[in-house]
UniProtKB/Swiss-Prot annotation:
It is found in: Cell projection, Cilium, Flagellum; Cytoplasmic vesicle, Secretory vesicle, Acrosome; Cytoplasm. One of its GO terms (cellular component) is cytoplasm. The keyword Cytoplasm applies. Specifically expressed in testis (at protein level). It comes from Rattus norvegicus. This is Cilia- and flagella-associated protein 119.
Amino acid sequence: MITPRSSQSLEMKVQTELEHSPKLQEEPDRSPSLVDSSVIRIGTDEQNESPAEATSSPVEVAEDPGANLFPPPLPQPRICMWKYLDIHSMHRLEKAATVEEMREVLAELLELGGPEQSLRDAIILDLFSHALIFCRQQGFSLEQTSAACALLQDLHKACVATPLGNVEECYRYFTSVLFCHGVRRPPFSIDLFKEEQLLALADYVVNTYFRHFKLYKYVFTPQVRLDLSLSYMGLQSLHLWPEEKEDEEATVEQAATPQEEEPEAVTEAEQQPSEVCILQTYIKCQLNKELRQLQQLVEERLKESEERLSNRLAALERPYQTPPSKGKSKAK
């Protein structure tokens, strides 16, 4: 939860950063969809979803095995009023009398499908419909509601930009964009929200989106699979035996002469020690060496502690000698 003291410190920090930032665009780009962003992934496993979900999902995932796994840099914070929902869209949402009607208009504006077509679209629709309900409860104007929805969309884009954990970076980006709409410093920031409205909006986003941050990342990003390969130094490289192409002929020959092939197999196994045995002996030798060093170190520590203890006991066993008293004062 953001306190007024922390908000003041964040405000000063954002002001200093905005002084050195480039000039913002006065007319931001508008997009019909709130979450149509292409996200780059490397060799990852996609979530299980139907083909309809893959086509109608607002978040597009590019399957590029050579892409970089590191998270992309977050964009510079800027004013996002009328960025995605323009004045005509906000008037249509304002005319909606019921929640169901508002959800239908919102799904049409964002080009989202129903829950039966895509679960991701249903999650996005719930996210922004609850945000609109919160804005109505707080009495936000059309400009404030549009900016709040755009802020939430930019935060969602930053969340799904990578499958790795970036909650701290997303929170810093969220607070920076939030203060771009709370401080009058054109063209970098405007005083669109009051202090109480900023705190209320920050508490709402923290208690809703950031509380379920990992769930959003799990749904909208692919799962990452990590493959490890270990190589031991000082060992011979393993050579894979070629597979037998004619299995039927080999089984027939083994059935014909079982007694002749068994001694040959035993002799070959005795002559060529397996790589597993070599690895086991090497590991045992290294473990024994480390254990001997550890045992020697423990013995030295025990000897030192015994010597210190014996010295203390000897000092305690000595008789206590009183310091020599000064001679009596001479009689007058």
